[in-house]
């Protein structure tokens, strides 16, 4: 492989979850929230070995006495000190590997600032001393995971949604579109909808309850207006949810009004296009000859595409925009929550990929900017 025969480590840094594992595996070994928690009041946790900060699941479990922070916002690392803690946790606690012995593949959102990639590279080589490193674009990896080399990926995670047209394994840079509207915004919007019926969730800890409600109960309506009408006429579709304190709340039309935001960002006053228009616009930026293949291979990826009914609705909305003779096919792989990671696992274990790594020697010679030459 590279310097040694150690398998590569693949880390998919999401705004909401960090997925990590060993190249060649078919699923990540660790998936934990990208959260750092610091005690609200130092010295309050009696009888526990108080740490200055908690990472991932542990922060999640103690969220009542912590202030929670996400170091990745909209797919971009905003706090490198916190991010370092997450990577450290990844290597030493979750995977139990020494980074000095393994090549490391990280992922990033398309159109990320150049400085962001350089800092990532610098941290990996200088803090963790990895022997070699690579950074790949998330959507391209998702397409690999679905077994295609041509298609358009609609990738929606916790912090950013993007549509990336890919032809023969190469992302077409002019046809990459992104909106900063994703899972975290849906969670906020869900809080707002529940507030309207008198349920007030506001703290960082309660937000996690809302996220759970969103993931368990929400779905995308095929026809929004008629769905609204159906809920007004009967309460058969209402679902109850038990809160951690034992109380039960009833979730009504919020179940589909929340994910509807993906198609109508105007609900929260955003002037973004919805994901159907984003997909269509991205395809229209491509060459006429390629469009047929793209319409026929719309691949969903990321946790925010896990809502039941989303594939059918996207297919319906894109069909309304596309030429009438065009065949539209939306692919929703069941493992799409992890497809970016799976694509990274496939890519980094290919024998043809082994020459692509940035080695420590190359980094020492050229500095962090080498990442723009070797990873595109």
Curated annotation (Swiss-Prot):
PROSITE patterns assigned: ACTINS_1, ACTINS_2, ACTINS_ACT_LIKE
Function: Actins are highly conserved proteins that are involved in various types of cell motility and are ubiquitously expressed in all eukaryotic cells.
E.C. number: 3.6.4.-
GO CC aspect terms: cytoplasm; cytoskeleton
Compartment list: Cytoplasm, Cytoskeleton
Family of the protein in this entry: Belongs to the actin family.
Superkingdom classification of source: Eukaryota
Catalysed reactions, semicolon-separated: ATP + H2O = ADP + phosphate + H(+)
SUPFAM superfamilies: Actin-like ATPase domain
Name of the protein described by the UniProt record: Actin, cytoplasmic
Assigned keywords, A-Z: ATP-binding, Cytoplasm, Cytoskeleton, Hydrolase, Nucleotide-binding
Primary site of residence: cytoplasm
A molecular function (GO) term: ATP binding
Pfam families (UniProt xref): Actin
């Amino acid at each position: 492989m590279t310097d040694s025969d150690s398998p590569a480590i693949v880390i998919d840094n999401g705004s909401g979850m960090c997925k990590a594992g060993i190249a060649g595996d078919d699923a990540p070994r660790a998936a934990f929230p990208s959260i750092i928690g610091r005690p609200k009041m130092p010295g309050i946790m009696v009888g526990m070995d108080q740490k200055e900060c908690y990472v991932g699941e542990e922060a999640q479990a103690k969220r009542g006495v912590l202030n929670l922070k996400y170091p990745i916002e909209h797919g971009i690392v905003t706090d490198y000190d916190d991010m370092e803690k997450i990577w450290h946790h990844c290597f030493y606690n979750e995977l139990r590997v020494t980074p000095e012995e393994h090549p490391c593949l990280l992922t990033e959102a398309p159109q990320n600032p150049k400085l962001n990639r350089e800092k990532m590279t610098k941290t990996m080589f200088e803090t963790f001393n990895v022997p070699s490193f690579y950074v790949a674009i998330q959507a391209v990896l998702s397409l690999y995971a679905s077994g295609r080399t041509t298609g358009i990926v609609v990738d929606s995670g916790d912090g950013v949604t993007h549509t990336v047209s890919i032809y023969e394994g190469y992302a077409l840079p002019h046809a990459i579109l992104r909106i900063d509207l994703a899972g975290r915004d849906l969670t906020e919007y869900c809080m707002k909808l529940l507030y309207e019926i008198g349920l007030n969730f506001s703290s960082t800890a309660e937000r996690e309850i809302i996220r759970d409600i969103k993931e368990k109960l929400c779905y995308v309506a095929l026809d929004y207006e008629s769905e609204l009408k159906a809920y007004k006429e009967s309460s058969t579709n209402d679902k109850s949810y038990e809160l951690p304190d034992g109380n039960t709340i009833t979730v009504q039309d919020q179940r589909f009004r929340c994910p509807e935001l993906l198609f109508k960002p105007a609900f929260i006053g955003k002037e973004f296009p919805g994901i159907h228009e984003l997909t269509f616009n991205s395809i229209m930026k491509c060459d006429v000859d390629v469009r047929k293949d793209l319409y026929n291979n719309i691949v969903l990826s990321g946790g925010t595409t896990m809502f039941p009914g989303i594939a059918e609705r996207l297919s319906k909305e894109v069909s309304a925009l596309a030429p009438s003779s065009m065949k539209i096919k939306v692919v929703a792989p069941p493992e799409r929550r992890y497809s970016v990671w799976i694509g990274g696992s496939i890519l980094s274990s290919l024998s043809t990929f082994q020459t692509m790594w940035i080695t420590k020697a190359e980094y020492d010679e050229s500095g962090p900017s080498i990442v723009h030459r070797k990873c595109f």
